[in-house]
């Protein structure tokens, strides 16, 4: 192919001159123009306009260059068009994320009747048997909150402590043969050896640790910390009274009024709010009802308006940063004891703390060793703490007239100086929240309709005005006044130190019982409210508990006399028990056998060596020797089997002293016997002769002492709810705070259990009673969602003959997406599975489980799509306001899903599905583009567009820079080519 020629500047000027002359002649044919063959030479100085026209010619001189320019402009046009579409779709994606979704309600119960297969009902006509199709009744019962409750047959114990005991059992054949068995001593020895050797083969010998790792002092410290670890007593050193009847604290949001949605979490100070009365009587006065309290302010509780010499509180809310709130209680205990020990006075057995425990606001020498300073917002969450501890009353007022500011002199306030309101200013800026009138009055329309016009009035429905002013959201005439209410220094005492010191002398039970009379109510209150003033506080008087130990003679009263044990046996027992003298220990998690009351019982059992053979002498005296040995054999076998199963044979152990020392009822004692464990840790033979044998069995007992027993229990199975939106299926379920529901005396108790062991009963270290989830309970439980496959089916047969069904499709009239209990009166096939009737045919609606609070849940509209794209569980909650807040916080991450995650065509398809029910036309167009890029153009084109989409914000800038560089290169290349041609 012949290469296209590009004219030089001289040639182009000659060609342009000919072109202009031809154009002139064609325009004016009456003129006669001679077109010369040669044009004069190019002048030395070519005009700029002529040079620019020549440059434009060179850029488009050949068809190849024209084709490249066309492709370049098409590429730029496609990029701009695609970027515009993506920007519009991004905005639609953002709107779809925060759009409210469906409301899920689990309170569904209905019935459905459908036709099934042939039943056994028939009629004879001649020789034919004609079957009648009978309807199969399918009973459908909804499951509230998606929680199925199944009976829990095992009681649940909240463990208080575990008692560790050790014992030696002596089995000596001489004890029986003396005076009872004369002829068959060898047979008796063989029988005893056979059983004991079998037991010895299965017992691993080990030594119990000497002494209890939890000493008496450690045990007392643990008990005291669990009860009063955060309790303190403050001596005011005088009579302290709060000076005002009301609190002007406008930095606190007000409780929602007039049906407004709750924007802020519940604040403790709201219970003291004085709202404007809706309707009053004609003779009603504010002074008679509220005293000098302003309507719209907060009331000071009456106990803080009376003389108080002391204050007591039990709360960890004021601790400074040293306190590890997120760590286990054992770590918290060690930290608290360490810091309290640092600030304790050096006086012996005094609970007084040094002033360095206070912050500087409460003591001139305070360094905040224990407590942090009280900030202005603490009055909203802990008003009782501020009223009890503060030495200064700081008002935070937006009421007209306070600090001398009124409407006419508002600009004198530093924040509103030279303030001129414009349309751009915040509507609350430099305005009073409460406007002051000339007087207050009661106005009546008739005898039954009177309303009160207060001295101060304002927009009460803007309950966050003061909070926004406190956070400097706009300039405001804030009035902050400081009123000194107390000048003397405080004296602080620790109840934990008092408990530990006095328990070492008077006993832990005596001290706890006396302290509970004073602090018992506080320990059951929340950390924000456990603050009360007290007048003339004194520490309780303790009494020593001296309980005389019964002698061995008294123990034997009313019981049959045991035969004396030989001196040789006593010596062996003393040798064997030498290492057990202090082996009252904790093998598992035993907290206390150091209680002084229990010590006597421990020694009783430890020193009371059971001679098994003697326990049966009275039963076998009247029998023949052979039968006597068989009788003994049966007892040995029973002992061996129980020991191998780690059970205690209570037939041979007197447990009355345990019940007496613990002071428990017969029912609790039955539980103790049932849950007690016996661990054999050594079996050895001390004498082995042809006619005589002796064995010693070393046993360690664990006796579990419960604090609470829960008997009527239900386990929960959390089924959740299915949601299909944006073309995808997801499962939504409430993260319940409890695992078991207990019904004692007809009352629902929701239990959360930790560190549980499933033995004969369920024994737990911690059992907490928590509020349930529901719209009316005030408990905002988290809700989780996860993506599922296109089809989901869960069928679980129940023990009563019904079926638990959760399906994404419907069949046999069974609804989709909701969990239901199905009961049929005959065999029917649903979901390709046979449902059979119960053994007892009964289809009435059965109350399978206790009732739970009503709950309606609104989820985000794109819950399923978000879960599908991310492939993770996304946390939402049961109030739509909280959902919007969480989505707003995660907006950056969610918007990043559009272009920065995955393949570009796949995202277009997902976005098309998401906008189908909101923007159908654009949805089909977007889905078509995604299908074209994925199916037609292939992976290369799709990957290229995915990359272009990823760098879209800077793509146009790079394109423009590239074009400028390309043009400069082309111009330079043309100039060099021209020089070479010349």
Curated annotation (Swiss-Prot):
It comes from Feline foamy virus (FFV). InterPro entries: Foamy_env. The keyword S-adenosyl-L-methionine does not apply. It comes from the Viruses. Residues 87-953 are lumenal. Glycans are attached at residues 118, 139, 266, 283, 307, 390, 409, 420, 489, 521, 536, 654, 690, 775, 800, 825. The lineage of its organism: Viruses, Riboviria, Pararnavirae, Artverviricota, Revtraviricetes. This is Envelope glycoprotein gp130. A motif (Endoplasmic reticulum retention signal) lies at residues 978-980. GO terms for cellular component: host cell endoplasmic reticulum membrane; membrane; viral envelope; virion membrane. The ER retention signal plays an important role in establishing the intracellular site of budding. The surface protein (SU) attaches the virus to the host cell by binding to the cell receptor. This interaction triggers the refolding of transmembrane protein (TM) and is thought to activate its fusogenic potential by unmasking its fusion peptide. The chain crosses the membrane at residues 64-86, 954-974.
């Amino acid at each position: 192919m012949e290469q296209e020629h590009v004219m030089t500047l001289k040639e182009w000027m000659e060609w342009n001159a000919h072109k202009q002359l031809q154009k002139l002649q064609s325009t004016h044919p009456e003129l006669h123009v001679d077109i010369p063959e040669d044009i004069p030479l190019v002048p030395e100085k070519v005009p700029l306009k002529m040079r620019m026209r020549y440059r434009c010619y060179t850029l488009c001189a050949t068809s190849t260059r024209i084709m490249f320019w066309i492709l370049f402009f098409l590429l730029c046009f496609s990029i701009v068009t695609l970027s515009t579409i993506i920007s519009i779709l991004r905005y639609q994606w953002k709107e779809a994320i925060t759009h409210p979704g469906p409301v899920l309600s689990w309170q569904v119960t209905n019935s459905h009747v459908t036709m099934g297969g042939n039943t056994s009902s028939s009629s004879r006509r001649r020789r034919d048997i004609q079957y009648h199709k009978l309807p199969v009744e399918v009973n459908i019962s909804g499951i509230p909150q998606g929680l199925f409750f199944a009976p829990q047959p095992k009681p649940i114990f909240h463990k208080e402590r575990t008692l560790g005991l050790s014992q030696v059992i002596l089995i000596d054949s001489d004890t029986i043969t003396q005076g009872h068995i004369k002829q068959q001593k060898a047979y008796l020895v063989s029988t005893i050896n056979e059983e004991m050797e079998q037991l010895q083969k299965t017992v691993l010998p080990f030594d119990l640790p000497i002494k209890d790792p939890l000493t008496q002092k450690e045990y007392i410290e643990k008990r005291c910390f669990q009860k009063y670890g955060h309790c303190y007593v403050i001596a005011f050193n005088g009579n302290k009274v709060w000076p005002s009847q009301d609190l002007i604290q406008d930095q606190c949001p007000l409780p929602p009024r007039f049906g407004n949605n709750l924007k802020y979490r519940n604040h403790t100070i709201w219970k003291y709010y004085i709202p404007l009365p809706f309707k009053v009587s004609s003779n009603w006065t504010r002074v008679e009802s509220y005293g000098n309290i302003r309507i719209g302010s907060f009331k000071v509780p009456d106990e803080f308006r009376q003389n108080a010499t002391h204050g007591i509180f039990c709360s960890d809310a004021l601790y400074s940063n040293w306190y590890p709130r997120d760590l286990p209680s054992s770590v918290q205990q060690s930290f608290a004891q360490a810091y309290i020990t640092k600030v304790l006075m050096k006086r012996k057995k005094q609970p007084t703390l040094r002033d360095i425990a206070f912050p500087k606001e409460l003591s001139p020498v305070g360094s905040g060793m224990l407590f942090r300073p009280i900030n202005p917002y603490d009055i909203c969450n802990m008003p009782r703490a501020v009223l009890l501890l503060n030495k200064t009353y700081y008002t935070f007022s937006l009421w007209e007239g306070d600090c001398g500011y009124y409407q006419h002199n508002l600009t004198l306030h530093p924040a509103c100086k030279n303030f001129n309101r414009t349309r751009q200013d915040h509507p609350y800026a430099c305005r009073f929240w409460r406007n002051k009138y000339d007087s207050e009055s009661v106005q009546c329309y008739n005898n039954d309709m009177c309303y009160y016009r207060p001295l101060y009035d304002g927009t009460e429905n803007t309950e966050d005005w003061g909070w926004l002013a406190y956070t400097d959201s706009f300039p405001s005439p804030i009035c902050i006044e400081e009123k000194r209410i107390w000048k003397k220094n405080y004296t602080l005492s620790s109840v934990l130190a008092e408990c530990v010191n006095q328990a070492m002398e008077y006993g832990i039970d005596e001290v706890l019982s006396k302290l509970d009379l004073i602090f018992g109510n506080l320990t059951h209150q929340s950390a924000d409210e456990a603050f009360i003033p007290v007048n003339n506080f004194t520490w309780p008087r303790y009494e020593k508990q001296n309980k005389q130990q019964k002698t061995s003679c008294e123990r034997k009263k009313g019981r049959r006399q045991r035969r004396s044990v030989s001196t040789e046996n006593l010596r062996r027992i003393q040798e064997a028990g030498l290492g057990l003298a202090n082996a009252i220990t904790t093998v598992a998690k035993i907290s206390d056998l150091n209680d002084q009351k229990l010590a006597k019982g421990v020694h009783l059992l430890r020193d009371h060596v059971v001679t098994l053979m003697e326990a049966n002498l009275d039963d076998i005296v009247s029998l023949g020797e052979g039968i006597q040995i068989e009788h003994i054999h049966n007892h040995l076998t029973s002992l061996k089997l129980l020991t191998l199963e780690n059970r205690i044979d209570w037939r041979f152990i007197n447990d009355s002293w345990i019940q007496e020392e613990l002071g428990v009822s017969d029912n609790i004692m039955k539980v103790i016997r049932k849950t007690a464990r016996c661990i054999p840790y050594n079996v050895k033979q001390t004498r082995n002769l042809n006619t005589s044998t002796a064995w010693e069995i070393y046993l360690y007992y664990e006796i579990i002492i419960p604090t609470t027993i829960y008997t009527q229990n239900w386990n929960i199975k959390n089924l959740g709810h299915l949601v299909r939106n944006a073309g995808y299926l997801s499962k939504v379920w409430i993260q319940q705070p409890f695992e078991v529901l207990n019904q004692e005396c007809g009352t629902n108790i929701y239990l959360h259990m930790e560190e549980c062991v499933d033995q004969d009963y369920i024994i737990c270290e911690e059992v907490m009673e928590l509020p349930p989830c529901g719209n009316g309970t005030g408990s905002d439980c988290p809700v989780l969602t996860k993506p599922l496959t296109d089809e989901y089916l869960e069928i679980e047969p129940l023990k009563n003959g019904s079926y638990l069904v959760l399906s994404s499709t419907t069949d046999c009239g069974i609804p989709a997406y909701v969990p239901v209990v199905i009961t049929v009166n005959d065999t029917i096939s649903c979901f390709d599975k046979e449902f059979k009737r119960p053994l007892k045919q009964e289809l009435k609606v059965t109350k399978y489980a206790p009732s739970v609070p009503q709950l309606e849940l609104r989820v985000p509209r794109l819950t399923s799509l978000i879960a599908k794209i991310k492939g993770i569980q996304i946390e939402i909650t049961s109030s739509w306001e909280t959902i919007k807040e969480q989505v707003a916080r995660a907006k950056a991450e969610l918007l990043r899903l559009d272009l920065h995650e995955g393949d570009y065509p796949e995202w277009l398809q997902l976005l098309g599905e998401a906008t189908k029910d909101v923007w159908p036309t654009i949805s089909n167009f977007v889905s078509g583009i995604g299908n074209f890029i994925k199916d037609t153009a292939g992976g290369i084109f799709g990957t290229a567009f995915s990359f272009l989409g990823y760098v879209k914000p800077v793509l146009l800038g790079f394109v423009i820079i590239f074009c400028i560089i390309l043009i400069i290169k082309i111009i330079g290349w043309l100039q060099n080519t021209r020089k070479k041609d010349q």
